[in-house]
Amino acid sequence: QNGGEKTIENIRQYLRKKKLYHCDYTIVRNIFLRNLYNYLKNLPLYIELNVNNKDYILVHAGIDPERTLDDQEEDTLLWIRDYFFLSECDLNKTYIFGHTPLCFINRDQSFNVWYDDEFHNKIGIDGGLALGERGQLNCICLDDGQVFVLKMSEVNDA
């Protein structure tokens, strides 16, 4: 869901391009997918970090603003949308999140990085790659706030 199937298919296509014999391909694929699964399963649901004396929370979808960070439910961290980015959260932290393609948040329906203009402590970075050709990969350097963008159309043209 939400791009996971496409990711797995891209991995399969990559492995097929290596021109492995079928039995070798199957072994390599199974080992790779098992390692990928274990890696993803063991990732934290959120990361707290401090960069240049500014506290950040990196989270897939967001948090329940009515709960403490330690009291969040896994489903909320992975699936919440509007209630998170439309609500006030701990103003001493900046929340960087994905999951919701920015064309559904930005007033201009772009995939550009979204900055919360009401509470000033949320940054959306989901450039909508799961939506196809219009999408882009958004990255932010937390040291200086510089934004880097790689548009899907530019990758396909290369």
Could you describe each region identified by the protein language model?
Residues 2, 6-124, 128-135:
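Acidic, His/Gly-enriched loop-helix segments that form or flank divalent-metal centers
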Residues 118-158:
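Binuclear metal-dependent phosphoesterase catalytic core
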